[in-house]
């Protein structure tokens, strides 16, 4: 092996080339690689954060859904209680109204019965007077004998 000037020139050129690459080419390449690694790491971290945020959002949505269901069930239960209360109040009002109408009807029936009895007494008294007139064959003056008529009506 001959070490001649060509080999020595090539070695010097190679060393200069390596120095030039290390000084001017290698740092931008390393910066680009490091920047790319950083972006990839940030992207992975963002993806992890997004997954965690998604899990938290799902948990929060589940909790809100449970709360909404509980609130809805509570509202439905209150509505059912209120419905039962309204139905009970309506039944009580209807019973009171029915009792009032029955009492009013009975009072009207009693008043009508008393009026009919009184009419009947008067008619019987009139018939009795007419019968007595025919029996006695004389006229009885109602004004003069009103006490007799009143006693007769009271007895009937």
Swiss-Prot record:
Gene3D superfamilies xrefs: F1F0 ATP synthase subunit B, membrane domain
Transmembrane feature ranges: 13-33
Membrane topology: Single-pass membrane protein
Record bears the keyword Ribosomal protein: no
InterPro entries according to UniProt: ATP_synth_B-like_membr_sf, ATP_synth_b/b'su_bac/chlpt, ATP_synth_F0_bsu_bac, ATP_synthase_B_chain
GO MF entries: proton-transporting ATP synthase activity, rotational mechanism; proton-transporting ATPase activity, rotational mechanism
Keywords: ATP synthesis, Cell inner membrane, Cell membrane, CF(0), Hydrogen ion transport, Ion transport, Membrane, Transmembrane, Transmembrane helix, Transport
Subcellular location: Cell inner membrane
Keyword Transmembrane helix attached: yes
Gene Ontology cellular component terms for the protein in this record: plasma membrane; proton-transporting ATP synthase complex
Main location: membrane
Role, per record: F(1)F(0) ATP synthase produces ATP from ADP in the presence of a proton or sodium gradient. F-type ATPases consist of two structural domains, F(1) containing the extramembraneous catalytic core and F(0) containing the membrane proton channel, linked together by a central stalk and a peripheral stalk. During catalysis, ATP synthesis in the catalytic domain of F(1) is coupled via a rotary mechanism of the central stalk subunits to proton translocation.
Family: Belongs to the ATPase B chain family.
PANTHER family xrefs: ATP SYNTHASE SUBUNIT B, ATP SYNTHASE SUBUNIT B', CHLOROPLASTIC
Subunit structure: F-type ATPases have 2 components, F(1) - the catalytic core - and F(0) - the membrane proton channel. F(1) has five subunits: alpha(3), beta(3), gamma(1), delta(1), epsilon(1). F(0) has three main subunits: a(1), b(2) and c(10-14). The alpha and beta chains form an alternating ring which encloses part of the gamma chain. F(1) is attached to F(0) by a central stalk formed by the gamma and epsilon chains, while a peripheral stalk is formed by the delta and b chains.
Name recorded for this polypeptide: ATP synthase subunit b
Organism of derivation: Shewanella woodyi (strain ATCC 51908 / MS32)
Gene name of the record: atpF
